From Swiss-Prot:
Organism of origin: Blochmanniella pennsylvanica (strain BPEN)
Database matches in InterPro entries: Ribosomal_uS7, Ribosomal_uS7_bac/org-type, Ribosomal_uS7_CS, Ribosomal_uS7_dom, Ribosomal_uS7_dom_sf
GO cellular component: small ribosomal subunit
Keywords: Ribonucleoprotein, Ribosomal protein, RNA-binding, rRNA-binding, tRNA-binding
Quaternary structure annotation from Swiss-Prot or TrEMBL: Part of the 30S ribosomal subunit. Contacts proteins S9 and S11.
One GO-annotated biological process of the protein: translation
CDD domains found in the cross-reference section: uS7_Bacteria
Gene: rpsG
A Pfam family that the UniProt record links to this protein: Ribosomal_S7
Family membership noted in the UniProt record: Belongs to the universal ribosomal protein uS7 family.
Protein name: Small ribosomal subunit protein uS7
Length: 156
């Protein structure tokens, strides 16, 4: 039980172009130093580039990419009797989305393409096809959770 008041979730307004809450959250995570218009232009041009490459609806393609990166389980450290165990825990939906978005953006920033628009479009395309660094990160997390399945009874 928290000693202070419980912080309420802030409502995020849907993005202006597609009216999607998920895309608005993605733009907010991508944003650096409060430059939201720059983040919006990067995301929208990346989605346009993705549309030209894959011939799918921008929003559908984005949601497919996000779905392929969402983790189902993750591990949390739990200290029991002097030793620390990596306990596999199911991930809530909001955290799944946030982690997937974070991993896609992180993987896009590590790429070596010319502009962030191209890097983001390439990473989203790879995520749709089930490859890329963000998908590898998810597979790695799932593998760690699978190997620590024996400690699942330590969940709280």
């Amino acid at each position: 039980m928290p000693r202070r008041r419980i912080v309420t979730k802030r409502n995020i307004l849907p993005d202006p172009r597609f009216g999607s809450d998920l895309l608005a959250k993605f733009i907010n995570i991508l944003m650096l130093n409060g430059k939201k218009s720059t983040a919006e232009s990067i995301v929208y041009s990346a989605l346009d580039s993705l549309f030209r490459r894959s011939n799918k609806n921008c929003l559908e393609a984005f949601e497919i990419a996000l779905n392929n990166v969402r983790p189902v389980v993750e591990v949390k450290s739990r200290r029991v009797g002097g030793s620390t165990y990596q306990v596999p825990v199911e991930v809530r939906l909001v955290r799944r989305n946030t982690l997937a978005m974070r991993w896609i953006i992180e993987a896009a920033r590590k790429r070596n393409d010319k502009s962030m628009e191209l890097r983001l479009a390439s990473e989203l395309l790879d995520a749709i096809e089930g490859k890329g660094h963000a998908v590898k990160k998810r597979e790695e997390i799932h593998r760690i959770a699978e190997s620590n399945k024996a400690f699942a009874h330590y969940r709280w």
